[in-house]
Amino acid sequence: SFTCVVKINDTEHTLEREVSTQRSFYEPWVIDGLRIWFDAVQDIFDFLAEAHGECCPRKHARFAIQDATLRICPEPIHPWCPLPEGGLKIEHCYRGEDCWLGAYNGASAHGGLDINHPAGTPLWAPFDIDDHYYFNSVEMGHNNNRWRGMHRWENGAEWILQAHHMTELTVQEHKPLKQGEQFARGAGVWSGDAEHSHFVFKVHDYGETILLDPWILFWQMYQDQQHFSFES
């Protein structure tokens, strides 16, 4: 676990996060009208390596903060994959450790979120995707099939999604995707001890690219599943 003390409107608040436990899938704090996701701190990298995907913050701590009356994004988010009933379970994150920042092999902070499901599980575009492609593939000589997709919002921010261990793409690379369109079958290439897909979420804005816990997106997907019907 890791903690911080933040001062908001002259009042101190102590925030605590756990990773590699069920509490990895936490509710954000709502304080004085702000929704706060306490994403990461540098201190844990005194004893954890960063050898399984980028995830260390550039400063002492990393937060995602927004107006608590707003959604994570302006439109409903379609499930990225079939959502496990009842929410994500830490025991279904590869070997029970590979949530965001979880200790992969007990020693390396995990730069993504693993969700166990069978090889060939459909993956869908959570929102419209402007461009997408394999940035690594077995065919190109890499040890994995890794997909990347981008969406640019009206305010200029770009959201970057990645999914690894892809069995195959089901659409042509660089073809724009509509929300809910299947783009791949997941979990089938170099997935190790348990078939799973590895999800990554980045935000590019103001000239910087920031990695964030993919749980933030999945949290909104579960919220939206209660209020919207999606076709796949």
Please report, for each region that a protein language model flagged, where it lies by residue:
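Short histidine-centered loop motifs in beta-beta connectors
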Residues: 118-119, 124-125, 155-182, 206
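Zn2+-dependent peptidoglycan hydrolase active-site motif and core
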Residues: 126-170, 194-200
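Envelope-exposed proteins and targeting segments
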Residues: 2-4, 32-34, 59-61, 66, ...
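Surface-exposed, glycine-biased beta-strand/turn segments
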Residues: 64-146, 178-179, 188, 222-232
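Surface-exposed, beta-sheet-biased, low-hydrophobicity segments with strongly acidic/polar composition
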Residues: 1-83
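Short, surface-exposed linear segments at secondary-structure transitions and domain or protein termini
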Residues: 21-35, 169-175, 220-230
